[in-house]
Structures are given as structure tokens and as C-alpha cells.
Amino acid sequence: MKFLDEAKVYIRSGDGGNGCVAFRREKFIEYGGPNGGNGGRGGDVIIETVDGLNTLIDYRYQQHFKAQKGGHGMGSDRHGAGGDDIVLKVPVGTQVFDEDRETLLHDFTRLGERFVIAKGGNGGFGNAHFKSSTNRAPRHANPGQPGEERWIWLRMKLIADAGLVGLPNAGKSTFLSVVSAAKPKIADYPFTTLHPQLGVVRSDGREFVLADIPGLIEGAHEGTGLGDRFLGHVERCRVLLHLVDATCEHAGKAYKIVRNELAAYEHDLTDKVEIVALNKIDAVTPEQLKEQKARLKRAAKQTPMLVSGVTGEGVPEVLRALTDVISEAPVSTKAKGEPTENETPPPSTGWSPLSN
């Protein structure tokens, strides 16, 4: 399945049905009175999170979504039928923005969450609604109210417990394939990973979701390489696993390049808990490993863990460190205050990517 994490769509809720002007006409009933029914309400446009989706690719092929109009009122006090709602299905972690791409309308963090993005128009009153003691034969009815229409942006941010970051070719995809059942593309050249990958990791009887993010290079925040657009997928992570290639020229400089790009992203990624690991230790000599470890320790201001995705050396220790941090770190939640009238209230406990 192709990966798409951003899409622009047009939505329109249904118009309300018109009210009806009608009078009761029966034999032997001279003054039957008004009996025009009301129009039906237009359908809503609803966005819902469903299981089994991790891309917005469906919205590349269809960008226009319109709910059904309400039925018109009829005589004999028959009201128009309400229009059918239309439901847009999105993955958990999707954010809805206004057309300006800056105004956040809703942030989906739970499975089965529903949000009414456009309400259908109300149906118009038929003339039976206007009858009174002073107006026994009203000859007017209301038209239905128009529905709402707008362009919106859907932006998906994967929800994972831990995120893999590092320079291209640092061994992130190999590490993910070793610790989970994920099968990312692996090759000996930079930018093998072109879009984020998710894997479920099991360690010491516990499970967590690990996200592999495409590699960052110097100047990524300015659009160099693949840019930093994929960093949004680690905003919700509770911990970052920073892999540094032991075979690179200078492990300390490689570490600082990625940290500078995380800081330039301006979404507090540098404030997240970080575990630093020196990868590919099987490909260097003991002397080189000692030198690279010292460089990385000075740059990261912490003792890096040593790991090899090829031989598996150090992998259990890294996973154990990740699970310990994940169990203690708080779940990232949206800071939007109380739920609006268009959304369902959140559960009392934090959401996890592995919860049902």
C-alpha cells in the first residue's frame, strides 16, 4: 500500500429540505386547514478513526465528499426524510486543519473517535407549522437551510511509543527488522527508507510500537534531502532512540547534526527522553569503537549503548531500556482543553497504540 500522510479534501454537508404548502382536501370537509409537512434535515459530514489504516492514500483518488440533502415536505403532514450522513475514515493520529493549514480543527488520538466536521442544514417548516388562531390558512413555508462547505487538510501523524532517528544509512531499518516483524526496505545506500515504518516490539513480556523515520541530513529543516516533514510522526512518541553509525567519520558530529535538525523543527522534540546507541559495532575495530564511543559520549553528554543490528549484540539491552522509559513516560495527549460539542469525550486513561 502506498504511503500518503497529507491530503486536501472538499466537504459539503447536505442542504435541508424545503417545507411544503398544502391544504387538506376531503369530501364534506370544507375548511380542511393546512397540512404541509416540514423538510428533512441534511446529512452531516463525519470523520471517524478506524482500525487497519496507516495511510491517507484513498484521498488522493477522491477529494470531494458531499452528504445527502434532506427530503422536501409533502402534503398530509408528511415530513421529508433526513439526508444520509457521509463518513470519512481515517487512521488514528490524523489531524484536521482548516484550509489555511494552520488552524487545528480536531486531533484524533483514539480508535473509533468520531467528529462532525460539517453539520447538515435544518429542514424548512411547512405551512402547517404556522397555523394559529389568527392565521388559519397560512400560505407560506420555509426553505431548507443550506449545508456547510469547506476545504480541509488531513494530516496523519503516526502514533508510536518510540521513534527511531538518525542520519541516513545509520542502520535504523535493519534494527527495526530485527526487533519486530516489520519488513522495511534495507540496502547499503542512503535514503533507503522513503516513508515511516511501524513495528510492534516485544521485550520482557511487554509490547510497544516503534516507528522508523526516514534519515535526516544537515539542512533538512530547509528542505534538503527528504526534508523534515516526517518528523511529525515522532511528535507523539514518548522516547527517541537515536542510532549513530559507528563506521561514520565522526560519531559526535553525526549526533549533533540530527540534534540540530530536531531543534529546528520547533515542536519540542529535543525535550523528549533520548536513548543514544552506537550502531554497527561489528563493522569497526576495538580501537575505532573506543574512539567513536568517547566522541559520542562527549557530544550526547551520556554514555551511549553499543548495539549491532546484524549480529544482535546489545539489542536486548536497548529494548529493555526503551520499555523502562516507555512505562514511566507520560502518554502524549493533545492540549486542546475540554472536548468540543462535535467530538466524543476522551476515555479516562491514556491511549496506547496497542490498546483495543
Curated annotation (Swiss-Prot):
<dbReference type="InterPro" id="IPR006074">
    <property type="entry name" value="GTP1-OBG_CS"/>
</dbReference>
<comment type="subunit">
    <text>Monomer.</text>
</comment>
<keyword id="KW-0547">Nucleotide-binding</keyword>
<dbReference type="GO" id="GO:0042254">
    <property type="term" value="P:ribosome biogenesis"/>
</dbReference>
<dbReference type="GO" id="GO:0003924">
    <property type="term" value="F:GTPase activity"/>
</dbReference>
<comment type="similarity">
    <text>Belongs to the TRAFAC class OBG-HflX-like GTPase superfamily. OBG GTPase family.</text>
</comment>
<keyword id="KW-0460">Magnesium</keyword>
<comment type="function">
    <text>An essential GTPase which binds GTP, GDP and possibly (p)ppGpp with moderate affinity, with high nucleotide exchange rates and a fairly low GTP hydrolysis rate. Plays a role in control of the cell cycle, stress response, ribosome biogenesis and in those bacteria that undergo differentiation, in morphogenesis control.</text>
</comment>
<dbReference type="InterPro" id="IPR036726">
    <property type="entry name" value="GTP1_OBG_dom_sf"/>
</dbReference>
<dbReference type="GO" id="GO:0005525">
    <property type="term" value="F:GTP binding"/>
</dbReference>
<dbReference type="InterPro" id="IPR045086">
    <property type="entry name" value="OBG_GTPase"/>
</dbReference>
<feature type="binding site">
    <location>
        <begin position="212"/>
        <end position="215"/>
    </location>
    <ligand>
        <name>GTP</name>
    </ligand>
</feature>
<feature type="domain" description="OBG-type G">
    <location>
        <begin position="160"/>
        <end position="327"/>
    </location>
</feature>
<dbReference type="InterPro" id="IPR027417">
    <property type="entry name" value="P-loop_NTPase"/>
</dbReference>
<dbReference type="Pfam" id="PF01926">
    <property type="entry name" value="MMR_HSR1"/>
</dbReference>
<dbReference type="InterPro" id="IPR006169">
    <property type="entry name" value="GTP1_OBG_dom"/>
</dbReference>
<feature type="region of interest" description="Disordered">
    <location>
        <begin position="329"/>
        <end position="356"/>
    </location>
</feature>
<feature type="domain" description="Obg">
    <location>
        <begin position="1"/>
        <end position="159"/>
    </location>
</feature>
<dbReference type="Pfam" id="PF01018">
    <property type="entry name" value="GTP1_OBG"/>
</dbReference>
<feature type="binding site">
    <location>
        <begin position="191"/>
        <end position="195"/>
    </location>
    <ligand>
        <name>GTP</name>
    </ligand>
</feature>
<feature type="binding site">
    <location>
        <begin position="308"/>
        <end position="310"/>
    </location>
    <ligand>
        <name>GTP</name>
    </ligand>
</feature>
<dbReference type="GO" id="GO:0005737">
    <property type="term" value="C:cytoplasm"/>
</dbReference>
<keyword id="KW-0342">GTP-binding</keyword>
<dbReference type="InterPro" id="IPR006073">
    <property type="entry name" value="GTP-bd"/>
</dbReference>
<keyword id="KW-0963">Cytoplasm</keyword>
<dbReference type="InterPro" id="IPR031167">
    <property type="entry name" value="G_OBG"/>
</dbReference>
<feature type="binding site">
    <location>
        <begin position="279"/>
        <end position="282"/>
    </location>
    <ligand>
        <name>GTP</name>
    </ligand>
</feature>
<dbReference type="InterPro" id="IPR014100">
    <property type="entry name" value="GTP-bd_Obg/CgtA"/>
</dbReference>
<protein>
    <recommendedName>
        <fullName>GTPase Obg</fullName>
        <ecNumber>3.6.5.-</ecNumber>
    </recommendedName>
</protein>
<feature type="binding site">
    <location>
        <position position="173"/>
    </location>
    <ligand>
        <name>Mg(2+)</name>
    </ligand>
</feature>
<keyword id="KW-0479">Metal-binding</keyword>
<feature type="binding site">
    <location>
        <begin position="166"/>
        <end position="173"/>
    </location>
    <ligand>
        <name>GTP</name>
    </ligand>
</feature>
<feature type="binding site">
    <location>
        <position position="193"/>
    </location>
    <ligand>
        <name>Mg(2+)</name>
    </ligand>
</feature>
<dbReference type="GO" id="GO:0000287">
    <property type="term" value="F:magnesium ion binding"/>
</dbReference>
<keyword id="KW-0378">Hydrolase</keyword>
